[in-house]
């Protein structure tokens, strides 16, 4: 499989502007790891789309290649009827010389809101994602397979629905139970 074939398996069929693969995308291609090129952000950080089945393997490879810090994990809703997105911002943390910039990459897993909202937990790789994954579950309903504490973090355990989804309808009334 060549570089074009690997990245094109997850690309959209629209004919928008051609996105050039960055160094991290090229490295993943050399490793045979399939991903989708997304437009870099305004400061040039690579954004890559990843299948849920490939996420753990790709992040494991990145961690072994120096991306040893999960700066942020979260989720967002693209809108009613559109995808729910689980994202990861990985960085390389080391001793830098003056003027050096850390390597950074963002991975995004696009999930059909009416399909399986399951991604593998990265807790085994980055223990700091414990509460971040729980918050993403609590607010968007994305399940993290293999997470050691898969329960709500912010909302009461008996809360119905996912408050940060754009199609969420807030209940008129919710009775809080005493914690005593």
Curated annotation (Swiss-Prot):
It holds the Pfam family Complex1_30kDa. It is a peripheral membrane protein. It catalyses: a plastoquinone + NADH + (n+1) H(+)(in) = a plastoquinol + NAD(+) + n H(+)(out); a plastoquinone + NADPH + (n+1) H(+)(in) = a plastoquinol + NADP(+) + n H(+)(out). It is an enzyme of class 7 (translocase). GO terms for molecular function: NADH dehydrogenase (ubiquinone) activity; quinone binding. It is found in: Cellular thylakoid membrane. Gene3D superfamilies: NADH:ubiquinone oxidoreductase, 30kDa subunit. GO terms for cellular component: plasma membrane-derived thylakoid membrane. It comes from the Bacteria. Residues 1-16 have a biased composition (Polar residues). One of its GO terms (biological process) is photosynthesis, light reaction. PROSITE patterns: COMPLEX1_30K. Keywords: Membrane, NAD, NADP, Plastoquinone, Quinone, Thylakoid, Translocase, Transport. Its EC number is 7.1.1.-. Disulfide bonds: none annotated. The keyword Transmembrane does not apply. InterPro entries: NADH_DH_suC, NADH_quin_OxRdtase_su_C/D-like, NADH_UbQ_OxRdtase_30kDa_su, NADH_UbQ_OxRdtase_CS. Residues 1-23 are annotated as: Disordered. Belongs to the complex I 30 kDa subunit family. NDH-1 shuttles electrons from an unknown electron donor, via FMN and iron-sulfur (Fe-S) centers, to quinones in the respiratory and/or the photosynthetic chain. The immediate electron acceptor for the enzyme in this species is believed to be plastoquinone. Couples the redox reaction to proton translocation, and thus conserves the redox energy in a proton gradient. Cyanobacterial NDH-1 also plays a role in inorganic carbon-concentration. NDH-1 can be composed of about 15 different subunits; different subcomplexes with different compositions have been identified which probably have different functions. This is NAD(P)H-quinone oxidoreductase subunit J. The lineage of its organism: Bacteria, Bacillati, Cyanobacteriota, Cyanophyceae, Synechococcales.
